[in-house]
């Protein structure tokens, strides 16, 4: 069987979502590890006054492509930016571009999607379902297409506790939903959304389930593979450890925890944190397309790209390693010292929200006003709470994903491909990964230099001293207000102090005894 780089040699690849997190990494990996690929067509829309070519060039100029620039300086010649709007009829392709794509494309990687959990249902359906259907219809016209590779999500069927590598029946017929949305106004769509999505937590997951069914039904005559990643995080190894460029998913929570803004979150310590590194998702996508292209399986291939079944990691462990990392390598200008409480208790959660989030933010905004600056912390806390509401479903529940197809795929790789396109998450050391992840948010998202660590540590020590001073003042105030005015309270206080003194005296005496 040919190797993965050999399979991609001379191939023309069509990629959607190339300006997104996953798409960028896939583009870089494809060009670096399969250097003889003929060309990569990237569908990109105009945005903020930038042409598709300018947007692609901005992506290629980023740090993510540093390694590729060193190894293959001429890689840009293989990338062809094509103006396309996935939400428009026929993808808004010009006739000339459409003809080129139909004549040349061998492999499609469909990574584009709206990943916002609070997306309006109409918009989510438009990009995640209708755009996917239009791409399938375009693929059916391609004369040399070998594989249609669709990136979904492992949570598409999160209403099930055990999820196999199959496409399940959709919650509603996608065609009927699309037809209904055409005559509904936005108010009606918003009203019926909770009833439509049912036991799924958001429109993103709901529409990704519909998209899978569209791929299965509309692409029945195509050679289709689906990869379902769980919670996609920073890179594990490639192009370098810890690369991340956005606040999405856990990244924003990690940063908020490192800044000392996030102090509590509704989560179960024992719930599985099914994080999967972005380079594992990319490697699996490239390998899955290779397998389907070489073997031409009779049925659609689905791969649950998850870690919980083979290398379990829990949210309590995530919290421990995140806080430990940020205490050793603090973020600059932290609001408070990093410390997070995980709780699944409703009352306790809201207590900590009031005491550890809202009260400090309110007091800090008063301080900003008094010093002539614009208050901002309450707005930050409000945005943080909205993000937490969307994520608590995933931090409070666990799922079991079948990974038989993933194991089969891994066994099909030759020794060299197993190294180059590593998908074996059993080798993943979580403590090291989380440390690199946190450092990645510091370096690549916040653009903080590691040379600033001494100053950041000094600032963290200052916050510690402020905390000790505040607690001391609080104890004195409690003494003056309550204890000093009550004889019973004073007697209890003296008894406790006396008991502590006797214990310390006994401990001292015991420690100086020689045997």
UniProtKB/Swiss-Prot annotation:
Region feature (Necessary and sufficient for PEX19-mediated localization into peroxisome membrane): 451-507
GO molecular function: any one? alcohol-forming very long-chain fatty acyl-CoA reductase activity
Claim: Hydrolase is one of the keywords in the record:
no
Q: Which GO terms describe its biological process?
A: ether lipid biosynthetic process; long-chain fatty-acyl-CoA metabolic process; wax biosynthetic process
EC class of the enzyme, as a word = oxidoreductase
Instruction: Cite the ranges annotated as topological domain Cytoplasmic.
Output: 1-465
The record's subcellular locations are: Peroxisome membrane
Per the record, its GO cellular-component terms are: peroxisomal membrane
SUPFAM superfamilies (UniProt xref):
NAD(P)-binding Rossmann-fold domains
**UniProt keywords, alphabetically:** Lipid biosynthesis, Lipid metabolism, Membrane, NADP, Oxidoreductase, Peroxisome, Transmembrane, Transmembrane helix
Q: What is its EC number?
A: 1.2.1.84
User: Which regions face the Peroxisomal side of the membrane?
Assistant: 484-515
Q: Which reaction does it catalyse?
A: a long-chain fatty acyl-CoA + 2 NADPH + 2 H(+) = a long-chain primary fatty alcohol + 2 NADP(+) + CoA; hexadecanoyl-CoA + 2 NADPH + 2 H(+) = hexadecan-1-ol + 2 NADP(+) + CoA; octadecanoyl-CoA + 2 NADPH + 2 H(+) = octadecan-1-ol + 2 NADP(+) + CoA; (9Z)-octadecenoyl-CoA + 2 NADPH + 2 H(+) = (9Z)-octadecen-1-ol + 2 NADP(+) + CoA
Transmembrane ranges, per UniProt, are 466-483
Show the disulfide pairing.
none
Looking at the Swiss-Prot or TrEMBL record, what is one Pfam family this protein matches?
Sterile
How is it placed in the membrane, per its record? Single-pass membrane protein
Do you know which InterPro entries this protein is assigned to? FAR, FAR_C, Far_NAD-bd, NAD(P)-bd_dom_sf
**Subunit structure of this chain's protein:** Interacts with PEX19; PEX19 mediates the targeting of FAR1 to peroxisomes.
Identify its protein family. Answer: Belongs to the fatty acyl-CoA reductase family.
* Record function comment: Catalyzes the reduction of saturated and unsaturated C16 or C18 fatty acyl-CoA to fatty alcohols. It plays an essential role in the production of ether lipids/plasmalogens which synthesis requires fatty alcohols. In parallel, it is also required for wax monoesters production since fatty alcohols also constitute a substrate for their synthesis.
**Protein's recorded name:** Fatty acyl-CoA reductase 1
Q: What gene is it encoded by?
A: FAR1
